[in-house]
Amino acid sequence: MKIAVYGKGGIGKSTTSCNISVALARRGQKVLQIGCDPKHDSTFTLTGFLIPTIIDTLQSKDYHYEDIWPEDVIHKGYGGVDCVEAGGPPAGAGCGGYVVGETVKLLKELNAFYEYDIILFDVLGDVVCGGFAAPLNYADYCVIITDNGFDALFAANRITASIREKARTHPLRLAGLVGNRTSRRDLINKYVEACPMPVIEVLPIIEDIRVSRVKGKTLFEMVGFEPSLNYVCNYYLGIADQILSQPEGIVPKEIPDRELFSLLSDLYLNPIGGGGQKKKNQENLLGFTRI
């Protein structure tokens, strides 16, 4: 099974992806996580350091695939999860989709692409071109990470459009949304009412999740010396169980941009309450922070 994880930049995709990968490994799956971001930090919480990228390795070998061994590009992470970082082209040049294609090509050359029960692609930011949508060419399911803010749901809607387009020629389905760092879910509920799709899980705001990223550890590793965090791991195990159930999934139909803006801004402009609290609610509903 191949899963592509998308979502707005900074929403917590990599942290979520790493914890889902460990959860899947805990369920007995052989897992490979592929980071698809020029920052090459997708697998940081699994390995504790920035591993060399596929592109760096190819360049060092003058793109001679026959000179590359699996251990040159596949690194062992926490919980037995194997890790690969695709890397990216130089800033302002090249195409991210090409890099993903080269990564898959190399893994196939190494006879590694089909050795895993689960391959999870952790993909950068919003879908803004066909190149960034390239991992969807290989995925069976897409999982969208969001929060209860306008920007994250707007990005989710763009990703939804890309899934619909790719599903015309590939056996791709949307598994559902995962809410991250979400103290309330009124905008999420409003969105999925208008654009029906499953909500796999909604994680509340948990400071230890953010701290785990800074420490370079998954929640599963942290729970070894902080047992009180076990309840957080259960969220990710629940997500893993839903993925392993091989859900039917859906081919979603995105909402037109103007309609989505009107839908979500209506709740922003007409919150319940008044006075200073009303103004504060308006800022929070759209994910804005006044500085």
From Swiss-Prot:
Q: Which amino acid positions bind ATP, per UniProt?
A: G10, I11, G12, K13, S14, T15, K39, N180, R181
Q: Taxonomically, which superkingdom? A: Eukaryota
In its UniProt record, a GO molecular function of this protein is:
oxidoreductase activity, acting on iron-sulfur proteins as donors
Enzyme kind, highest EC tier: oxidoreductase
Sites binding [4Fe-4S] cluster sit at C95, C129
- Please give one Pfam family short name: Fer4_NifH
SUPFAM superfamilies attached here?
A: P-loop containing nucleoside triphosphate hydrolases
Q: Which residues bind Mg(2+)?
A: S14
Q: In which pathway does it act?
A: Porphyrin-containing compound metabolism; chlorophyll biosynthesis (light-independent)
Q: Which UniProt keywords apply?
A: 4Fe-4S, ATP-binding, Chlorophyll biosynthesis, Chloroplast, Iron, Iron-sulfur, Magnesium, Metal-binding, Nucleotide-binding, Oxidoreductase, Photosynthesis, Plastid
- Provide the catalytic activity annotation: chlorophyllide a + oxidized 2[4Fe-4S]-[ferredoxin] + 2 ADP + 2 phosphate = protochlorophyllide a + reduced 2[4Fe-4S]-[ferredoxin] + 2 ATP + 2 H2O
Give the GO terms filed under biological process for this record. Answer: light-independent chlorophyll biosynthetic process; photosynthesis, dark reaction
The EC designation for this entry is 1.3.7.7
Q: Which CDD domains match?
A: Bchl-like (cd02032)
Q: Where in the cell is it found?
A: Plastid, Chloroplast
Query: What PROSITE patterns does this protein map onto?
Result: NIFH_FRXC_1, NIFH_FRXC_2, NIFH_FRXC_3
**In this entry, which stretches build a coiled coil?**
none
This entry's comment on the bound cofactor is: Binds 1 [4Fe-4S] cluster per dimer.
Cofactors required: [4Fe-4S] cluster
A GO cellular component term found in this entry reads: chloroplast
Assembly and partners?
Answer: Homodimer. Protochlorophyllide reductase is composed of three subunits; ChlL, ChlN and ChlB.
**What's this chain's function?**
Component of the dark-operative protochlorophyllide reductase (DPOR) that uses Mg-ATP and reduced ferredoxin to reduce ring D of protochlorophyllide (Pchlide) to form chlorophyllide a (Chlide). This reaction is light-independent. The L component serves as a unique electron donor to the NB-component of the complex, and binds Mg-ATP.
Concerning its family, UniProt says: Belongs to the NifH/BchL/ChlL family.
Listed name of the protein? Light-independent protochlorophyllide reductase iron-sulfur ATP-binding protein
* UniProt organism field: Picea abies (Norway spruce)
The major lineage groups are: Eukaryota, Viridiplantae, Streptophyta, Embryophyta, Tracheophyta
